[in-house]
Amino acid sequence: MAIRQLPEILINQIAAGEVVERPASVVKELVENALDAGATRVDIELEEGGVRLIRIRDNGGGITPDELPLAVSRHATSKIASLDDLETVATLGFRGEALPSIASVSRFTLTSRRHDAEHGSALEIDGGRLGEVVPRAHAPGTTVEVRELFFNVPARRKFLRAERTELGHIEEWLRSLALARPDVELRVSHNGKPSRRYKPGDLYSDARLGETLGDDFARQALRVDHSGAGLRLHGWVAQPHYSRASTDQQYLYVNGRSVRERSVAHAVKMAYGDVLFHGRQPAYVLFLELDPARVDVNVHPAKHEVRFREARLIHDFVYRTLQDALAHTRAGATPNSIGGDGTGYTAATSGGMGGIASGGVPGNGGASIGSGGAYSYASWTPSQTPLGLRVDEARAAYSALYAPPPSSAQQSAGMPNMAGTGLPATAQDSGVPPLGYAIAQLHGIYILAENAEGLIVVDMHAAHERIGYERLKHAHDSIGLHAQPLLVPMTLAVGEREADTAEREAETLATLGFEITRAGPQSLHVRSIPALLANAEPEALLRDVLSDLREHGQSRRIASARDELLSTMACHGAVRANRRLTVPEMNALLRDMEATERSGQCNHGRPTWARFTLSDIDRWFLRGR
C-alpha cells in the first residue's frame, strides 16, 4: 500500500480524538483560552449537555480580523515562540491544537473584537471547511460557538452519554476552575435557563470554597500554607472524619493548572494513612507553586498530566507538609483555626508523651500544648505535664487547679462539695479548655463533658487508644529501627529492575533495617531485616518496598507495618468499654487528648469525639421559637 499525505481535515479529526473527548473537553479548552486572554467574566451557554450547542463568551483581549484564520490553524498560538518558552510555559494553553481540532468535528463560529476596534469580525467553519472573515457587531472580547459536536464523526457521537451525564462532566470541570480562579465571574446556562453563577471574589477565598464544595467541606477544612526549597503548597485539606467514599473532592493544581499527578496523590494518601478510616478517601484542594522550568506540562495534548523534574523532592515536600498539618489537629480544636491567622498550620511545641498507667502502655516524659493558634486559650495554661490515668497522683493537682472553694451559700443549701470531684463551678468560666470538664459517663463507653460552647461526647476507648498509639510511636521514633541479622542470609529472586533499585537504594534500605547485597543480575542476598517485624513476611515486604522506591523514591511500608503492630498494642492496652471512670480520670483523659497529635481520630480513622453546641441543643427542644 502506497504512503500518502493525509488531508488537513482528517489530520485535525485525528488530533480531535486526543483533545476533544466529550463536550466537557470543548468547554475546558475554550474557557482556558478565554482566561489566557485576560477575561474576568465568562458566560457559558449549553444545550443538550453541550452536544447541540456550546457558546463561550468572554471579555478578554479579543482577536484582530486578520488573525482569525490563523487562530484556527494547527499549531498557531500567541503563547510560545521558542523551545525556551515551551520549557517555562505558564499559560493554560500553548499547543495551538484546540481550535482547529474542535472546528473539524463541529459547526464552528469564531467572533471577536479588540477593545480598540470599532466592530467585531466573524469566521465560520463547517466540519473543518473554512469560510470567509466577515464584519459582525460584537462587544469587546470573543465568542466561540460550537454546534452539533461530532456531527461528521458518528462513531464518536454514539459513544457520548446521556444529556445529564455530559452536563455533569461540564459542571465538575467548572467547579475545578472556580476553585482555582475565584477572581473570575462564571455564568452558566443550560437549555435557555440559568443553572449556575460563580461570583468573583478574593483569591483562594473561603467563600468560594463553600460555594463550590459546600459549607460542610468549608467548616471541616484546614488551611495549609507552607513554603520551602523553592516550592509552595497552599489550600485546604479536610479533617479525616470528613472523608469520602470516592475521590470526587480531590483537586490538585500545579501553577494554577488542574492536573492529575500520581506522586502527589500518593504523598497525600501517605499523609492521611494514619488517620483515615479503611477504604475512605481524603478531600482536599491543593495548589502547588514552583518554577515553571521545574515542571513539564507538555505530556499529553489534553494537558491533564504533568511531569516533575524533581519528583522525589516534591513528593517528600507534599507528604511532610500535610503530615505536619494533620498532626497538629488535636481534639477540641476548631478546623479553620489551624494556624490561627489563617496563613497555615503552626506546630505545637515538641516534647515527650506522658504515660498511661492503666493501659500498660509505656511513656517517656511529658508533653506541652502549643502556645499559639488554635491551642491557646484564655487563662488555662497549666505548667505541669499532661496527666495520665494515675488518679491517686493526679487528684490533688486537679483539685487545686480546677476546683474553686465552695461558697457558704452552697454549703448551707446542701449542694455537694465540688472540691473532691475535680470539676469547676461552671464550664462557662473563662479559661475553659477545649474539651471542657467531665460531668458524667454514659453506659461505660462515652464521657460527657461541658465546655464553653456546649456538650462534648468522647469515645473513651478510641481516645485512649490514639493516645497510647502516639506515645508508642514517639518512643520508637526516638530509638530508630533496629536491624536483626539473619543466621542464614536469604536469597531473593527478583526482576532486574528490582535488583537495580536495591543496589541504587542500598543506603535507604539500611535505614529501614534491611542489609542487602546484589548476588546476581536477578537475585539479592538479604542479611538483616527490621527487628520489630521479624515475624512478618520479609520477602513480600521487601518487594513492596522496592516497588515504592522505584516509583516514588521512598517507601513507608516499614513504617506502616510497624505502626500497624504498635496500633494493635495500643488497642489492647486501651481502657475498655464498661469500665467506670471517676471524674478526675475522665478529666485526665480529656487533657491528654488536647495534648496529643491526631487525637481527633482513633488508630482506625474513626472519630474520638463530637461537639454539640448549646444552639444545637436549643433547636432540639425548640427553644427561642
From Swiss-Prot:
GO molecular function: ATP binding; ATP hydrolysis activity; ATP-dependent DNA damage sensor activity; mismatched DNA binding
UniProt KW keywords: DNA damage, DNA repair
Role noted for this protein: This protein is involved in the repair of mismatches in DNA. It is required for dam-dependent methyl-directed DNA mismatch repair. May act as a 'molecular matchmaker', a protein that promotes the formation of a stable complex between two or more DNA-binding proteins in an ATP-dependent manner without itself being part of a final effector complex.
Protein name as catalogued: DNA mismatch repair protein MutL
Source species, domain of life: Bacteria
Pfam families found in the cross-reference section: DNA_mis_repair, HATPase_c_3, MutL_C
PROSITE patterns recorded: DNA_MISMATCH_REPAIR_1 (PS00058)
Gene: mutL
